[in-house]
Amino acid sequence: MRLRRLGEFASVMIVSVAVVLTGQSVASATPPGTTYYVALGDSLSQGFMPLTGNSNEGYVDQIYAQLHQSQPQLQLVKLGCSGETTTTMRQGGICSYPGAGSQLAAAVAFLRTHRGSVKYVTIDIGANDIDPCAASGVIDQTCVAESLATIGRNLLAILVSLRAAGGFGPQYAGMTYYDPFLAAWLLGPAGQALARESVQVANTLNGLEAFEYRIFGLQMADVSGAFHTNDFTEVPFGSGTVPLNVATICALTFMCTLNNIHPNVRGYAVIAGAFQAVVSAKPN
């Protein structure tokens, strides 16, 4: 019931802000010459992997490579910050940006300066707000409720700022998250209970973020679906079986080998594919 009340509260706030946004003027047509893809986010947007750190093999890089094939004038502006939360995206404190105090401020400044030349904006944010709620091996529901409230409030402000700065010219896209804590299934009955509970939390987070993204006109990359997050169908695994969602987490992330939540190169390719399904390479 507590989570439901949070969702209702967020809904009222979102609709109120959306009414304000409808008064924004439409961005001018993209001029000839250089165009831009602006990518915001946390470590996923930086292609982080535990053995190499930030990389050029993440989903952002793979999306850009695909778009660049048909749009050689397109340049990538990669603003993501490993460890970023919705709060630090707004206020700063982790990564530095020349002339800007936060990732959001840097994005807003770039969008304003290059209004009409930005073709794509993607974002992933929120996982670092809520992942600590399972740090002890159990899910702290009070932490979850507080984190969801923070995410809802901050994401609203982030999206208001991005749309006000970028206008209606770019294609905007956000993503749902996969659930790395499904890997706990391999630890036995207690881990399996944690895994099932974590899916409920992931669904609540994804539902909240998807609702806010759609209110502000963002396309949704269904990463949760691509990782089969809700599919507990048993499939072969080693000498036995596990649910498909568990096998997928083991195959596409480092959770079952290095106990690290980040995707491997294959996992980043799956995330990129989810974005590519909703982001068009056609000219605006």
Language-model features, listed with the residues they occupy:
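Secretory targeting and sorting signals
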Residues: R2-A29
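A structural preference for short, hydrophobic beta-strand core positions in alpha/beta folds
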Residues: M13, V17, K78, G174, ...
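Serine-esterase "nucleophile elbow" of acetyl-processing enzymes
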Residues: S28-E84
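Acidic/histidine-rich helix-loop elements
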Residues: F48-E57, G83-G99, I139-T142, E146
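Substrate-binding cleft and catalytic face of glycoside hydrolase catalytic domains
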Residues: V77-T87, I123-D129
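Alpha-helical cap/lid subdomain in secreted, periplasmic
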Residues: P98-I261, V265, A269, Q276
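Short, low-complexity, Pro/Ser/Thr/Gly-rich segments in the mature regions of secreted, periplasmic
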Residues: A274-N284
